[in-house]
Curated annotation (Swiss-Prot):
Oligomeric and partner information: Homooctamer. Interacts with VP1; this interaction is weak. Interacts with NSP5; this interaction leads to up-regulation of NSP5 phosphorylation and formation of viral factories. Interacts with host DCP1A, DCP1B, DDX6, EDC4 and EIF2S1/eIF2-alpha; these interactions are probably part of the sequestration of some host SGs and PBs proteins in viral factories.
Name of the protein in question: Non-structural protein 2
Protein's UniProt keywords contain RNA-binding: yes
Location of this chain's protein in the cell: Host cytoplasm
InterPro entries xref list: Rota_NS35_C, Rota_NS35_N, Rotavirus_NSP2, Rotavirus_NSP2_C, Rotavirus_NSP2_N
GO cellular component, one term: host cell cytoplasm
Active site: 225
EC primary class: hydrolase
Family of this protein: Belongs to the rotavirus NSP2 family.
Length: 317
């Protein structure tokens, strides 16, 4: 995750702003600079290489002292920054909005995946600039539309029916901020269209999850799609979701946190996010992840549980 101010800076033109991507050398200069505390939140002028991000975001970049940040010296950083600017410059951002836009926390890996989709000649985003920019604006929280299958970050499709598409995320192969754990495995489920979904299509998805992904929890980050993650990583997701929710709320970037369909979401996660939306502390919310919560009733009593052992998935073991 990183703020949009880590990728670009605004330049006032008439009554709106044009966004310009940072270059690698300007960032590198900022990372070595000594800056007064009072200037930590201001864009840094490197003199030689142009404007750089505010020094308060130093930890967002990979350095000798911090291996958890973005690999900003890669060509992928340049591509992501340019794509963000292209999308923002297709809209009108006024002075009253600029602070909240730049402080918005976005998924670095999501944006890299959109670059990869753009470069894939077989992908619809390669052929449609309008759909590409729409996908980016959704990814950076500049659009209130949810991420659907057409505008999704992408990955490897492992399941699809009339209503849903399930993707295996390919973060292990990323350049900008790769997942370093070789055992990482995670999925995302997007809706194919933003319209009501029939019971039969929901039932198909639940059956697929129950039998093929029984070692995983179905959660949501509140953005209109589902994530299918290992139970061992749920607490980490909770920390990130809570921090992003609070940060966006504090900076005035509050979008509606979508709890999604309670029949699909893991009941403990539904309790966690509901508690978070009520304004409770992180510790109070996280306790709900480890309590035994029983569903009031089986939402799909016709869904058979009669499966032979060799039909039950070993994914995630």
């Amino acid at each position: 995750m990183a703020e949009l101010a880590c990728f670009c800076y605004p330049h006032l033109e008439n009554d709106s702003y044009k966004f310009i991507p940072f270059n690698n050398l300007a960032i590198k200069c900022m990372l070595t600079a000594k800056v007064d505390k009072k200037d930590q939140d201001k864009f840094y002028n490197s003199i030689i290489y142009g404007i750089a991000p505010p020094p308060q975001f130093k930890k967002r970049y990979n350095t000798n002292d911090n291996s958890r940040g973005m690999n900003y010296e890669t060509s992928m950083f340049n591509k992501v920054a340019a794509l963000i600017c292209e999308a923002l410059n297709s809209t009108k951002v006024t002075q009253s909005d600029i602070a909240s836009v730049l402080s918005r926390v976005v998924s670095v890996r999501h944006l890299e995946n959109l670059v990869l989709r753009r470069e894939n000649h077989q992908d619809v985003l390669f052929h449609s600039k309008e759909l590409l920019l729409k996908s980016v604006l959704i990814a950076i929280g500049h659009s209130k539309e949810i991420e659907t299958t057409a505008t999704a970050e992408g990955g490897e499709i492992v399941f699809q029916n009339t209503a849903f598409t399930m993707w295996r995320l390919t973060y292990l192969e990323h350049k900008l901020m790769p997942i370093l754990d070789p055992n990482f495995i995670e999925y995302k489920i997007t809706v194919n269209e933003g319209k009501p979904i029939s019971e039969s299509h929901i039932k198909e998805l639940i059956a697929e999850l129950r039998w093929q992904y029984n070692k995983f929890a179905v959660i949501t980050h509140g953005k209109g799609h589902y994530r299918v993650v290992k139970y061992s990583s749920v607490a980490n997701h909770a920390d990130r979701v809570y921090a992003t929710y609070k940060s966006n709320n504090k900076n005035g970037n509050m979008l509606e946190f979508n709890l999604l369909d309670q029949r699909i979401i893991w009941q403990n996660w539904y309790a966690f996010t509901s508690s978070m939306k009520q304004g409770n502390t992180l510790d109070t919310c996280k306790k709900l992840l480890f309590q035994k919560i029983k569903r009031e009733s089986n939402p799909f009593k016709g869904l058979s549980t009669d499966r032979k052992m060799d039909e039950v998935s070993q994914i995630g073991i």
